[in-house]
């Protein structure tokens, strides 16, 4: 059977081979669909590779709706589940360029600005462990099947020689792990001190190595953390590139305090992440969960044994989106991009980035759909939602659409199966008759072997079990090899860019020489011009304009850095501390949630009589005290800076609050500062500013722009202005959901307090 993939095209009709190679290497978004608007895909079950046919883009689209009605609906409803392009059946296949556009409208989606934090991305290990415990206890209360690792009734008694050998191996791998972790941590720290931005993978590796060091040597908390705080002013002097060089303060004291606040805030957030990595440890001896997972993974990949559905669902949760995407092969990444109708040409890093953004958008939409209810969706909305999730959307009944969308929401939101696994099962075109567990089993069979070690560590951490040093060592070395490979790819890309620029300069010089030679021939050819005019006066000429595809303006990595510097400079000119205060409040919320999660874990464990078996690690307790002290010091720094600002502005009343819209700047202000930093064409600056101005009122929130830039800046890729606008919409949805979840948690806590009283 065949599969037909109709994707949107923004490319010109003709391209040179050099431009095609350049776009393939850089992964430009000129050919890709945006994150929320996708084209129509007609797919049937096929074990083959995804194929595709490219149709002309929206330059030839005709809207059948009344334009004024369409604009009114767009203004009051910012969220689209999809825009479906249906080719006109009256036209032949090769000439279909007129489409009927059907819009699927949501309900009650108010517009507001973007505010996002790192907590929107994923849950911490403590939260995932708590969720696992709650699910297990709930199933025990309901009498359902609960998977638990098997424990040998009579453990094999080891000889003295075997015990000595095992202890020697344990300490050998432990010391080797400590040495490698220390080496990696020092190297990453040196990169940070010298102003280099760690990639997403490098930061995860840095966090893991620091957690391992504190876990192996808990007493280092008393040495390293106070030492780092004490030497912070010295580090800022010796390594000025740690922070952007755009500080323009009125006093040296204010500059010093702001730099110290910025670095302390980043350090405290990193330490809080480390705390959650090493939070709990299990003192009781239980079944080896890592061996259970290894047996399960071997069952589904090698042997013909079929694991239970409970095992499949339980272990599928370990393959989180970032873990899965970071280890997928290129053909699998390309297949996912084609399934989601994204740009499938580009580097692996670029493909992963757009997939991560798309998965986050799907996750936000899933929560909004679950809140509104699947039954409230129209047929067009159901088709759009199913197609975006890689499910069959045409040729099926409305009841079938609702059923498969409900099944998706059940697996994703209730069973907590990662979106990447659900999409991979759709990308392989498995039969609809297969159960969800069988689909997940087949998907796990096709995952790379390299993911097994990483998932093996995760399953032990979520179960509070100890992971042996050898497994951790293998995982660390495996991740280090992947980081080196990514760095090699980036270096090759930079070299290719440099070679291309040199080639363009050579071609421009040759063109100048040819132009000079051409001027010499002008006089000789001028004598023959009258004859040429007479000959060609009757020649027919085509005066129609040359059609070119609509292409979004590309923003390079250097321009993203420049935009970040411009926002920092504007913040310093306005003496704004709103972002720092917001991040500090988020950090306080993280610390409070961490404490509440620990208390909940103890209550859940007490239901099974295991509250004494699990305790908070010593390193985690010591780091928590240090983070609380740092929060107190940062509060004092912010208070001191605000007092200085009041004195400078003549506002002596301590109760004065910042006016509404203090963070807003005009587009012209942003463009002016960007011009001062780097010489960029006017049309490029206008396109960047227009992408950031979502509501088109000429005003931009500095903190919102910084958050978007920080998200993009972690990836070494070029990005289009259209994609920047889509990221802002995605972050807006996530913030809306976060506020609703906070309000819901607050109501639940108040109700629980009333019940206790």
From Swiss-Prot:
Keywords, in A-Z order: Antiport, Calcium, Calcium transport, Coiled coil, Ion transport, Membrane, Metal-binding, Mitochondrion, Mitochondrion inner membrane, Potassium, Potassium transport, Transit peptide, Transmembrane, Transmembrane helix, Transport
Transmembrane segments: 216-236
Family recorded in the similarity comment: Belongs to the LETM1 family.
Coiled coil, from the record: 476-521, 554-618, 722-755
Key word Repeat present: no
UniProt topological domain (Mitochondrial intermembrane) ranges: 114-215
InterPro entries for this protein: EF-hand-dom_pair, EF_Hand_1_Ca_BS, EF_hand_dom, LETM1-like_RBD, LETM1/MDM38-like
GO molecular function terms listed in the Swiss-Prot or TrEMBL record: calcium ion binding; calcium:proton antiporter activity; ribosome binding
This protein's record includes keyword Transmembrane: yes
Reaction catalyzed: Ca(2+)(in) + 2 H(+)(out) = Ca(2+)(out) + 2 H(+)(in); K(+)(in) + H(+)(out) = K(+)(out) + H(+)(in)
Residue span(s) of domain EF-hand: 680-715
One GO biological process term: protein homooligomerization
A single Gene Ontology CC term: mitochondrial inner membrane
Entry function: Plays an important role in maintenance of mitochondrial morphology and in mediating either calcium or potassium/proton antiport. Mediates proton-dependent calcium efflux from mitochondrion. Also functions as an electroneutral mitochondrial proton/potassium exchanger. Required for the maintenance of the tubular shape and cristae organization.
Highest taxon listed in the record's lineage: Eukaryota
Residues involved in Ca(2+) binding: 693, 695, 697, 699, 704
UniProt subcellular location: Mitochondrion inner membrane
Protein name: Mitochondrial proton/calcium exchanger protein
Pfam families the UniProt entry points to: LETM1_RBD
Residue ranges annotated as Mitochondrial matrix topological domain: 237-757
Transit peptide: 1-113
């Amino acid at each position: 059977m065949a599969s037909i993939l109709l994707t949107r095209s923004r490319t010109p009709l003709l391209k040179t081979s050099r431009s095609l190679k350049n776009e393939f290497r850089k992964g430009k978004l000129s050919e890709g669909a945006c994150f929320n608007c996708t084209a129509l895909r007609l797919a049937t079950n096929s074990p083959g590779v995804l194929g595709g046919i490219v149709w002309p883009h929206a330059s030839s689209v005709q809207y059948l709706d009344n334009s004024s009605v369409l604009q009114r609906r767009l203004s009051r409803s910012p969220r689209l589940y999809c825009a479906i392009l249906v080719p006109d059946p009256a036209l032949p296949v090769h000439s279909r360029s007129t489409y009927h556009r059907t819009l699927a409208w949501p309900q009650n989606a108010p517009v507001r600005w973007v505010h996002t934090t790192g907590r929107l991305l994923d849950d911490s290990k403590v939260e995932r462990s708590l969720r696992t415990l709650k699910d297990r206890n709930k199933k025990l209360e309901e009498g359902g099947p609960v998977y638990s690792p098997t424990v040998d009734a009579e453990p094999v008694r080891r000889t003295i020689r075997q015990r000595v050998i095992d202890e020697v191996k344990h300490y050998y791998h432990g010391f080797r792990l400590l040495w490698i972790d220390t080496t990696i941590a020092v190297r990453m720290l040196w990169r940070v001190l010298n102003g280099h931005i760690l990639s997403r993978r490098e930061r995860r590796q840095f966090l893991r190595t620091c957690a391992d060091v504190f876990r192996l040597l808990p007493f280092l908390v008393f040495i390293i953390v106070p030492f780092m705080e004490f030497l912070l002013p010295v580090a800022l002097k010796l390594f000025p590139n740690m922070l952007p060089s755009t500080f323009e303060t009125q006093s040296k004291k204010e500059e010093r305090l702001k730099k110290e606040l910025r670095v302390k805030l980043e350090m405290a957030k990193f330490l809080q992440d480390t705390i959650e990595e090493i939070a709990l440890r299990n003192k009781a001896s239980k079944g080896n969960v890592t061996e259970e997972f290894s047996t399960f993974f071997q069952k589904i990949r090698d042997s013909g044994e079929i694991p239970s559905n409970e095992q499949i669902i339980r272990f599928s949760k370990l393959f989180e989106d970032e873990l899965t995407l970071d280890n997928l092969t290129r053909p699998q990444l390309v297949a996912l991009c084609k399934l989601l109708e994204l740009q499938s040409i580009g580097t692996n890093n670029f493909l992963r980035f757009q997939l991560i953004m798309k998965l986050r958008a799907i996750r936000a939409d899933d929560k909004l759909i679950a809140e509104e209810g699947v039954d409230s969706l129209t047929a067009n909305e159901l088709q759009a939602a199913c197609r975006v999730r890689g499910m069959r959307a045409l040729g099926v009944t409305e009841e079938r659409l609702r059923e498969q969308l409900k099944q998706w929401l059940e697996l994703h939101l209730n069973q907590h199966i990662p979106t990447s696994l659900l999409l991979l099962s759709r990308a392989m075109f498995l039969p609809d008759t297969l159960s969800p567990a069988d689909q997940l089993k087949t998907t796990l069979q096709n995952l790379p072997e390299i993911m097994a070690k990483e998932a093996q560590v995760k399953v032990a951490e979520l179960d509070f079990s100890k992971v042996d040093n050898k497994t951790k060592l293998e995982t660390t070395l495996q991740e280090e090899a992947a980081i080196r490979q990514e760095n090699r790819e980036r270096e090759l890309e930079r070299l290719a860019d440099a070679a291309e620029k040199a080639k363009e300069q050579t071609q421009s010089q040759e063109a100048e020489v040819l132009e000079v030679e051409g001027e010499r021939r002008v006089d000789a050819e001028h004598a023959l011009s009258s004859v040429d005019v007479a000959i060609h006066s009757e020649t027919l000429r085509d005066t129609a304009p040359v059609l070119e595809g609509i292409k979004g303006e590309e923003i390079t990595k250097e321009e993203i850095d420049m935009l970040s510097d411009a926002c920092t400079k504007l913040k310093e000119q306005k003496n704004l501390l709103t972002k720092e205060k917001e991040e500090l409040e988020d950090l306080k919320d993280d610390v409070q949630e961490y404490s509440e999660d620990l208390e909940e874990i103890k209550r859940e464990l007490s239901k099974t009589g295991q509250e004494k078996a699990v305790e908070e690690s010593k390193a985690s307790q010591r780091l928590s005290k240090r983070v609380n002290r740092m929060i107190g010091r940062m509060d004092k720094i912010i208070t001191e800076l605000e007092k200085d600002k009041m004195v400078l502005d003549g506002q002596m009343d301590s109760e004065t609050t910042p006016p509404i819209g203090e963070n807003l700047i005009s587009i012209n202000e942003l463009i002016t500062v960007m011009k001062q930093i780097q010489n960029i064409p006017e049309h490029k600056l206008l396109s960047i500013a227009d992408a950031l101005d979502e509501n088109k009122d000429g005003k931009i929130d500095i903190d919102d722009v910084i958050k978007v830039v920080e998200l993009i800046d972690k990836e070494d890729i070029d990005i289009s202005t259209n994609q920047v606008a889509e990221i802002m919409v995605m972050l807006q949805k996530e913030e809306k959901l976060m506020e609703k979840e906070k309000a819901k948690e607050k109501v639940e806590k108040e109700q629980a307090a009333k019940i206790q009283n």
